[in-house]
Amino acid sequence: MSVSDELQQREQAALESYQLLPRLLHTVDAVDTSSVFLGTRVDTPIVPMRYNTAPDAPTHLCFLDADHLLATGEIDGDESSAYDLQQCVLALTPGKMGALMPKVRKLVATKPLALALDMTKLADTPPYGEQRWHPRSREDIAELQAAAGVPLWLYGIASVADAEVASEAGVEAIVVDSSSGLHLAAPATADIFPDIFDAVAGTVAIHAGGLVRSGIDVFRYLALGAETVVVRSDRALTNLQHELNYAMRLTGCATLADIGYEAIFAPLFEES
């Protein structure tokens, strides 16, 4: 079994430990998954991660691979672009600061919703990959945030310590994803999320980015406190959305604000 498969198994087991509680005696007929996010009204908390595909609708968000867009010339340092990026979070690999800053300036010129550093790329440094090791300090993050002029996200936060550093550095948001600990047998995203939420909720926006197989998994992350769920999946967004709507109806949650711990069952101890 590959290391990636082992991580998937841990992620799946952690998610399945949170069981949805059916509530059928209520008056919820239709559900509303919209919210106001960074001043923009969006229809769904599901945020797909893509290489070069614009959001499915003006009221949807998406993560885009900024390194890919820069390398292919689809972003060239002004407001003209193959896509309208005002609904996009543009994710960069955390390289050297001297190389990052010119990229940040080019990306900011396109007026994206936010920029992000994809810290999960550091899991692929030697001896497990060819990505160069360029960690970022609190001061680096604060400098990038100041230079960006748009909200800065950190994708791939997998510990309370890093979440606290991110909060202290003044970033807008973190995305919790244990892929950063791929080769460390790190805790699954759903396992570490509650600790991170308890530590920094209210000081930084917290999103989830772990394994998502269905809209039911999206619901689980939302119940743990995620504002949105960043999804690396080939599944159609509409299918995930239909499944999330189903989960909300069957648990009596009319809006995203209704989704919370009371909608899930997570036994702490097994009976001996």
Give the label of every model feature segment.
Residues 36-78:
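Active-site cofactor/substrate anionic-group-binding motifs, chiefly glycine-
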Residues 98-109, 158-171, 195-208, 212-228, ...:
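Catalytic cores of alpha/beta
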Residues 82-91, 133-153, 185-208, 239-247:
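Alpha-helix-loop-beta-strand connector modules within alpha/beta enzyme cores
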Residues 121, 169-187, 212, 218-238:
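Glycine-rich phosphate-binding active-site loops on the catalytic face of alpha/beta enzymes
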Residues 64-70, 83-88, 109-113, 147-150, ...:
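Glycine-enriched alpha-helix->loop->beta-strand junction motifs that scaffold or abut catalytic
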Residues 1-8, 235-272:
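C-terminal extensions of enzymes
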Residues 1-43, 268-272:
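An N-cap/entry alpha-helix motif that binds or orients negatively charged groups
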